[in-house]
Amino acid sequence: MYVGYLLDKDTNMYPSPVRHPSLNLNPQNYVPGPPQYSDFASYHHVPGINNDPHHGQPAAAWGSPYTPAKEDWHSYGTAAASAATNPGQFGFSPPDFNPMQPHAGSGLLPPAISSSVPQLSPNAQRRTPYEWMRRSIPSTSSSGKTRTKDKYRVVYTDHQRLELEKEFHYSRYITIRRKAELAAALGLTERQVKIWFQNRRAKERKVNKKKLQQQSQPTSTTTPTPPAVGTPGPMGTLCSGSAPSLVSSSPLTIKEEFMP
């Protein structure tokens, strides 16, 4: 009553008196309800008191921390209950397990989402092999490189080998400047040219060593061999190996002559 008295007394301070929007009453005939408390929102609302459907709802001027109840909550609850009783209307159910498809007017999910679900097939159950399980096929690249164990070996063309052999015949040790020029002319890197010259020098040393071994073998076969024991020497004399046998046999013959 005190609040209504202040509203009627001083209209300048309260130009728009506070009243519930559902009551079509004039400001003079407005009678406020029970006094509202600041901590009223913390209490639970008990329906049916004084048969007032808006009893216990704070006015807008008091700034209730909770938003008023929406009118479409009841319809939302019925829709949720109907959806729970019929789970086949959801679009996220896989088509293999539930043959029912979502209706266009259900409002849950558009039909485009349900149509984008991929159809399961026996081929989809196959697992793709890992990279290390796949069979490795040696790829023949056009750069002329082949893989030997853990290193790459450059396969030189006939033209490249011919030019490198010419340069090696001129000088077995190539200079830095000539190495750069030859690499640019043959389409190789300086490192490849350097490695080719190193391998070529090693091959030449191996060939020269083999030639020296072949030349030393005929000289060793022409050396004179010692004569066998008991064979006559070059002047018709016996070898020294028969001399002990003659000396040992002479005393025996002497003893036999003087025996009685």
From Swiss-Prot:
SMART domains: HOX. It comes from the Eukaryota. GO terms for cellular component: nucleus. It is found in: Nucleus. Residues 149-208 bind DNA. GO terms for molecular function: DNA-binding transcription factor activity; DNA-binding transcription factor activity, RNA polymerase II-specific; methyl-CpG binding; RNA polymerase II transcription regulatory region sequence-specific DNA binding; transcription cis-regulatory region binding. Residues 152-173 are annotated as: Interaction with DNA. The keyword Coiled coil does not apply. Residues 213-223, 240-252 have a biased composition (Low complexity). It holds the Pfam family Caudal_act. SUPFAM superfamilies: Homeodomain-like (SSF46689). Its main location: nucleus. PROSITE patterns: HOMEOBOX_1, HOMEOBOX_2. GO terms for biological process: anterior/posterior axis specification; cell differentiation; digestive tract development; embryonic pattern specification; positive regulation of transcription by RNA polymerase II; regulation of transcription by RNA polymerase II. PANTHER family: HOMEOBOX PROTEIN CDX, HOMEOBOX PROTEIN CDX-1. Belongs to the Caudal homeobox family. This is Homeobox protein CDX-1. It comes from Gallus gallus (Chicken).
